[in-house]
Amino acid sequence: MADLQTMRAIYLMAHGGPEALVYRNDIPIPAPRRSEVLIKVGAAGINNTDINTRVGWYSKGEGDAADASWGGQALSFPRIQGADICGEVVDVGEQADPGLIGKRVLVEPCLREANGEPLVSPWYIGSECDGGFADYVTVAARHAYPIDSSLSDAELASFPCSYSTAENMLTRAQVTENDTLLITGASGGVGSAAIQLAKARGASVIAVASGAKQQSVLDAGANRALIRGNSLHDELGDNAVDVVIDLVGGEDWPELLNILRPFGRYAVSGAIAGPIVELDLRTLYLKDQRFAGCTVLDEGVFSRLVGLIERGDIKPLLARSFPLESLSEAQAFFLDKQFTGKLVIDMGL
């Protein structure tokens, strides 16, 4: 590390389209603060969070930069994005465990500590602070989880954001082996993760995806696949499932509550078909349904995820890898949605 002073990275210069992403090879390598580690990034996954942040989707106004970060604050530019990170610890701050040096780690994306200080409100790496679309990144040591796995860095980088989001949703919905789940957006990163994680809990899974992706969600472990856009009522009838894991929202959203049984649990962590939905409160209260918004990870979610990976209980669904300088191309491919699983930036390409 002593001879290296600069690194490659992709700077996000402003909210906007792919033109706001700028490749640089002269960015100073960050130094770890007292309780931080410095990670040499092996791979970093592509996900909705980074694109939503880039375009200002989180703003409740018209893309107003004052509230367009994941945490609802103004984003600081330039920003290095990248929430899915696998790499090797190469340096530590004075209060971090030097035994971490040389360890391969996954980074928990939802941060409760940054810049050596505890956070009042959690941050998301790559939004409120720099992330993994770079050769090096710093993070609080508590958020760098050593992992013992034969999987490649690219395969491991497919896990952190999508799988922790999915596991958090299943945790909030208290999913057990006695439950039947409906998962919307089931072919995407979080959806395909939710299939595997729900099956690991012994639950039965109904996956909703496009017609072209029916077999892929069945291959991921779903017990049944439904074509997106078809009537859920016609396919399943009312009161058919115990849990809905929703990543889609949109105009068909009321159907989800109709197929959800009395005392059923609804968990949401995405709205790719639109964030504004129509709710008939009578359905909610007369059926005693429970809602869970899922953003901040519950304590223990990420450590459980690492354990599942190490035991081989879940498998990576790596669709394609791209080099760092092709991030714009990778995000365009991501938005085209003609794949199942995860896309990854592989720093070795």
Regions found by a protein language model. Give the residues of each.
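C-terminal hydrophobic helical "lid"/dimerization subdomain
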Residues: 2-5, 13, 168, 299-349
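Glycine-rich beta-strand-centered segment in the early N-terminal region that forms part
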Residues: 28-45, 59-111, 148-150
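NAD(P)H dinucleotide-binding glycine-rich loop of Rossmann-like/cofactor-binding domains
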Residues: 71-75, 108-185
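Conserved "cap/hinge" positions at secondary-structure junctions
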Residues: 93, 109-110, 185, 209, ...
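Glycine-rich phosphate-binding loop and adjacent beta-alpha segment
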Residues: 121-122, 251-317, 346-349
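Hydrophobic/small residue at the entry helix of a nucleotide-binding pocket
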Residues: 165, 189-190, 213, 251
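Adenosine-nucleotide cofactor-binding segment
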Residues: 180-183, 199-252
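N-terminal Rossmann NAD(P)H-binding glycine-rich loop of SDR-like oxidoreductase domains
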Residues: 187, 195
